[in-house]
Amino acid sequence: NGWIYSYSAKDDRLARFRTDGSQYEWVGEAEIKSGRYYISNGNVVYSVSNDGTTTIKCFNTEKKTTDTLKTFDTTSAWINGLYGNHLLYEVYDAKKEGDVVTGGTMRFYLYNLNSGTDYTLGNDKIEGTVWNDQIFLCDKAGNAELRSLQDPMIVTKEFKLPNALLGNISTSARLVLAVGKNLAFATDGEGSQVKILLMNSEWKELTSFTVN
C-alpha cells in the first residue's frame, strides 16, 4: 500500500495516490513542474526559475513542509539527481563583458540534505551522475573521474571514456546516465546521428545503437 507519484498535465501539478486507491493528494505547491523534480526518501526536490534566478527547494511529504535549499542569481542551474539524501546539481558560472556572455565554467556540487553540507566537485566537468554508489564526472573530451559519496572531495579514480561525448548540444541535455550497474553515454555517430554506448563497470561495451 505504497505511493505512486504522477504528474497531472491537465492540472499542471504533481500528485500521488495509494496503490490500493484509498488515498489521493496533491504533492507540495503548484510550482513543482514536470521534468524539474526528483523524489527520494520522502523528499521531493525541485527547481523554480524566474526573474533571472533559480531556487532549489525540498518538499517533505511526511511533514508537509517546503524548505529552500539553494538560490542562484542565474537560470543556468540544474538538478542532476537525488540519490538517497545526496543532491547532485550543476551551475554554469558565466563570464560577461558588459551584458555579453564571453565564456564560463560548469561546476558540479553535492548537497547533503541531512547535514546541509555543500561540496564543490571541481570545474569544467559537463556531465555527472551517481553510479554504483560513486559520483561520476566527466568533461566533453571524455576525461572522467570517480568520487566517494561519503567523502566527495576525494577523487578515487581518473580515467578516459572510450569516446568523447556528443558535440554541439545544449548544456541542459543529459549525455551520461546510470542504467543499473551500467553507464550509458551519447557520442557522435555518422553524419547527424547520435551513437549511444552502454558500458559495464569494467568498461566493456555491452551494446550500442544509433538514433537520428
Residue ranges and their predicted role:
Residues 5-6, 46-47, 87-90, 136-138, ...:
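Residue position within the beta-strands of beta-propeller blades
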Residues 1, 5-17, 22-26, 31-41:
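Long, acidic/polar, low-complexity amphipathic helices and coiled-coil-like
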Residues 1, 31-41, 74-84, 122-134, ...:
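Repeated scaffold domains used in trafficking and secretory/extracellular systems
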Residues 167-199:
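Ankyrin-repeat and related helical/solenoid repeat scaffolds used for protein-protein interactions
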Residues 10, 50-51, 93, 141, ...:
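Residue-level signature of beta-propeller blades and closely related beta-rich strand-turn architectures
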